[in-house]
């Protein structure tokens, strides 16, 4: 059985990618666009545990950017034990990933693809 992913794996994988910035507060990673604006590609899921109360970080789940809503739908349909969504993410190209259900190898692919979605084209092309 493949080892399941952890937040430490997320951090290690994300920080190996070019020009990645880790958030000073919270658990999130981004890459600057051409103008220097940070574009998030992986972050902790902020779960609403109690209705009408603030969302709280769920350390076992990350949100990962995907290329488009078609890819999101495909991931959600193919592996619902690994990937899910919630109404907050309706119409937004990201999936929620259960870390205890995804292998480190799969996590590497997800994070690299998420980074490519947000990185400037010239930077993303060098990483291929």
Residue ranges and their predicted role:
Residues 1-128:
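Charge-dense, helix-prone N-terminal extensions
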